[in-house]
Amino acid sequence: APAGERMPKAAFEVAAKGAVLVDAESGEVLFEQDAHKELPLASVTKVMTMLLVMEAVDSGKITLDDSVTISERAASMGGSQIWLKENEQMTVSDMLKAVCVVSANDCAVALAETVAGSEEAFVERMNQRAAELGMADTHFCNATGLPAEGHVTSAYDIALMSRELISRYPEVLTYSSVWMEDITHVTRKGSSKFTLTNTNKLLRSYEGCMGLKTGSTSIAKYCLSAVAKRNGITLIASVMAAPDPKTRFRDAAALLNYGFSKCILYTDDVPEKLKPL
């Protein structure tokens, strides 16, 4: 069939400039709208950052319990952050949680430096990993998603890296599904609590949502990679450049609803009474 006819035309459109819905298990694309349009992705970048950190844990290079000393550069990142101070120490696990839940730029850079020695070296690895995953619409310039010329991806590529992250490291979903949690800052002045509140409002409003990653800047508008699971089916909805936060979450919910209404999970379970004696 001609390229444009392969997929049945969905009965709706989303307001986002790029969107895709993927079955997490098979990788099948269930819906797409401008799925390969190259756009800035803001903090959804951190899906790749988290993937590389989890791979470093997996390979034994670092552990989740390792304590990391925060560099001056990581502490100075600006944007969404948990206000880490230079020379403060925090575990890889707590920093991953802060990246996932509140999109902490300071933690993202500290983790990048821990894994690769510098954010620049880490970014090289991000681009290498993107190429390995077939993310042809993607180029990373930093580990945070802070605005940078030429830092782009597509809705399709977001789904690719999200699928790789959650299929290989499903434990990340225990971080991304945290709605609210305290983490402790320990500095020379003593310890203090910092409350993380998740940036993904679908966690509260969409049944089965397990979070993953939001992103927004004035340039990128409102982006999201959302994972939801119902009846044994896991879907990934990727939305880019929605005009406002409400539309971003509404578009993602519409995609997920469409997917769950289309998906029937076939299992090999034979009803008890049909089994041979």
Predicted regions and their residues:
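Domain-terminus/edge residues, biased toward the C-terminal soluble/receptor-binding domains
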Residues: 135-139, 147-277
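Active-site-adjacent loops and short helices of periplasmic peptidoglycan-processing enzymes
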Residues: 2-156, 162-167
